[in-house]
């Protein structure tokens, strides 16, 4: 991967990914919270696929193949917030802007389990009846049966983060250790977090680009280069520890 270099003048690292510790803390707290555990399937799918928030808001049961464990990304849902008193908040279905956006994403085991959990819940409590631009059968809806909007998801992330951090600080103090603090982040950071984990474990840039749906491979390369920089520091620290000769 020596040919991958950062281009001068590009703004790198503006949207930071969660660390593995932070990601694990966020998901564990969400899944085990009686207040927030119903959000766990949505966040699992976001963190386990790297899909854009609009792609997951718009995903339907017919877009996933549970037998082959594949997700077909072929459209997105855009949320238009109210701009004036006379204008309503609206959703609209849109097609991917580029061919790269139309793709198939394999399900990892936790993602498959999240879909199955959601399916069993809806099988017992009722499936979504929302219709949008002729589409129906949407998987993720709110408690009112409507589609989620990114602003509401971000508010939930904020509540989870604040509740977790408050409890973690007290717990860490009691256990006499440093707390694992979750920083401010939005639903858009979850895509970047997935891509970062992917880059940490995969060296084939084209595979990463295909799964992420990046139209321009430079976008993928930028994230890979950023991860490589972090890995270099970790590798040197590990080497120093293992050598133990200085």
What residue spans do the PLM features occupy?
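C-terminal secondary-structure termini that scaffold catalytic or DNA-interacting sites
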Residues: 68, 75, 79-102, 109-111, ...
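Catalytic-site neighborhood detector that most strongly recognizes the C-terminal catalytic loop/helix
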Residues: 9, 77-79, 193, 212-237
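C-terminal catalytic core of Y-nucleophile DNA break-rejoin enzymes
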Residues: 12-13, 72, 81-82, 93-117, ...
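Gram-positive cell-envelope targeting signals
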Residues: 17, 38, 48, 55-58, ...
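Basic, Lys/Arg- and aromatic-enriched nucleic-acid-binding interface segment
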Residues: 1-53, 57-59, 66-67, 78, ...
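Short, basic (Lys/Arg/His-rich) helix/loop patches that form interaction surfaces
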Residues: 28-39, 105, 121-131, 135-147, ...
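Short, polar N-cap/turn motifs at the start of nucleic acid-interacting alpha helices
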Residues: 63-70, 203-223
């Amino acid at each position: 991967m020596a040919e991958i270099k950062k281009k001068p003048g590009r703004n790198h690292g503006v949207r930071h990914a969660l660390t593995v510790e932070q990601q694990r803390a966020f998901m564990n707290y969400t899944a085990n919270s009686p207040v927030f555990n119903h959000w766990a399937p949505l966040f699992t799918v976001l963190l386990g696929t790297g899909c854009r928030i609009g792609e997951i808001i718009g995903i339907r049961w017919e877009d996933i193949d549970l037998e082959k464990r594949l997700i077909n990304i072929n459209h997105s849902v855009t949320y238009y917030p109210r701009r004036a008193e006379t204008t309503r908040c609206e959703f609209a279905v849109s097609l991917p802007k580029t061919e790269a956006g139309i793709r198939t994403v394999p399900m990892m085991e936790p993602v498959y389990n999240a879909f199955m959990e959601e399916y069993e819940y809806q099988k017992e409590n009722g499936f979504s009846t929302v219709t949008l631009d002729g589409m129906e059968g949407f998987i993720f809806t709110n408690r009112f049966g409507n589609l989620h909007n990114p602003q509401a998801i971000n508010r939930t992330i904020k509540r989870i983060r604040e509740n977790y951090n408050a409890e973690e600080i007290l717990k860490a103090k009691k256990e006499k250790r440093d707390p694992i603090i979750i920083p401010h982040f939005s639903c858009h950071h979850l895509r970047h977090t997935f891509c970062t984990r992917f880059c940490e474990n995969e060296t084939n840039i084209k595979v990463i680009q295909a799964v992420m749906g990046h139209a321009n491979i430079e976008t993928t390369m930028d994230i890979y280069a950023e991860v490589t920089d972090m890995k270099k520091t970790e590798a040197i620290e590990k080497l120093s520890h293992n050598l133990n000769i200085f």
